[in-house]
């Protein structure tokens, strides 16, 4: 049915026997109106299959009741779980959600932000490819980053008074590495996402936590901390093969869930089993990790999404903009299963 055939608020008012102003108050849930009149209007609206004109409402209220989410990699189940939690929480609060994927590319992120700004969203939730204000072109600082309420999640942008909902990647990588050292491993490698390391601090923080634990134990890590682009299968296989061929590796920490599949393929081709020949810890406790009894780092995806959405909506509905940065740090959990064992050479 075209818009011209849809019932208008005048039609609803006529059917209910009230003024247009009263119908507007009843449908918009504002102002003073008796329960009896409100019920008449709502009944009339239902009978006529009335659909509110959101554009007109937003022009009157100066709010679109829409928030945007710019995510770094929608193919990553970690981000997918966060977005699902954001969407659910936003819907509970009466907000619609627009989703944009930057695919870990800064130029695409800026395009997404410019497009979303043109749609006059009320606020933006952002897992950014930028780590500092200085990296962002001035045009976008002025038209987006200083204009809209913004909350970042998983990743922080230094130099802005934003709320950031994060996890302590350094501390968890340190904990994972200490766990493997405690099992007698002294040939511990990491494999991280090349694309993510280029544009965010996540992989770097995990690598730093890993190195700190090894330094503390007096264990070398030369050449055992690599990154790969999982979308380039042949190159990824080559790098992992080199890692396993030229180093005495007894354990591997896979720093990004997007890499796990390619890593396991290489182990399968080399007829290497875990934990018998190599111990493995992965990031993000997904369903296949549980099925394969893989020791994993469980991330608080739902809580991160809910807190990010709640924080943004509170800012949108606040009378004054946020003046100081706020960091909310959530706990990750090491879930120990059967992919690690005591190193027999210990």
Where do the PLM segments sit?
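N-terminal helix-turn-helix DNA-binding module of bacterial transcription factors
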Residues: 1-64, 341
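Hinge/beta->alpha junction and helix N-cap segments in small-molecule ligand-binding domains
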Residues: 72-81, 99-108, 130, 165-175, ...
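Helix C-cap/helix->beta junction micro-motif
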Residues: 48, 93, 144-148, 217, ...
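Alpha-helical recognition/docking segments in bacterial nutrient-uptake
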Residues: 1-8, 62-178, 182, 242-248
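Flexible loop/turn connectors
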Residues: 237-346
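Short beta-strand segments enriched in small/hydrophobic residues
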Residues: 15, 20-22, 59-75, 125, ...
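Short acidic capping loops at alpha-helix termini that bridge into adjacent secondary structure
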Residues: 186-187, 221-224, 273-280
């Amino acid at each position: 049915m075209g818009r011209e055939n849809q019932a208008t608020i005048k039609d609803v008012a006529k059917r209910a026997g009230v003024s247009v102003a009263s119908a507007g108050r009843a449908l918009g849930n504002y102002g003073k109106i008796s329960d009896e009149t409100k019920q008449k209007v709502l009944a009339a609206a239902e009978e006529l299959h009335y659909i509110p004109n959101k554009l007109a409402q937003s022009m009157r209220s100066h709010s679109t009741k829409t928030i945007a989410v710019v995510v770094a990699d929608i193919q990553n189940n970690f981000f997918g779980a966060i977005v699902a939690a954001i969407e659910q929480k936003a819907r509970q609060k009466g907000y619609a959600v627009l989703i944009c994927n930057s695919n870990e590319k800064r130029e695409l992120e800026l395009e997404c932000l410019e497009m979303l700004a043109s749609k006059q969203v009320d606020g933006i939730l952002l897992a950014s490819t930028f780590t500092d204000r200085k990296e962002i072109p001035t045009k976008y600082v002025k038209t987006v980053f200083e204009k809209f309420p913004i909350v970042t999640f998983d990743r922080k942008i230094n130099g802005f008074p934003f709320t950031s909902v994060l996890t302590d990647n350094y501390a968890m990588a340190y904990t994972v590495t200490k766990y493997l050292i405690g099992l007698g491993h002294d040939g511990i490698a990491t494999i991280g996402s090349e694309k993510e390391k280029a544009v965010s601090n996540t992989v770097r923080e995990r690598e730093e936590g890993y190195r700190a634990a090894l330094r503390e134990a007096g264990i070398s890590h030369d050449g055992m901390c690599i990154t790969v682009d999982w979308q380039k299968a042949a190159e990824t296989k080559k790098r992992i093969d080199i890692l396993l061929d030229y180093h005495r590796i007894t354990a591997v920490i896979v720093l990004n869930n997007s890499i796990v599949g390619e890593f396991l393929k290489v182990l399968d081709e080399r007829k290497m089993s875990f934990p018998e020949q190599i111990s493995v810890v992965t990031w993000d406790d997904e369903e296949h990790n549980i099925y394969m009894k893989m020791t994993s780092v469980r991330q608080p995806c739902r809580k991160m999404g809910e807190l990010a959405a709640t924080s943004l909506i509170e800012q949108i509905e606040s009378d004054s903009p946020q003046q100081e940065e706020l960091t909310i740090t959530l706990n990750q959990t090491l879930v120990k299963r059967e992919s690690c064992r005591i190193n027999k050479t210990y």
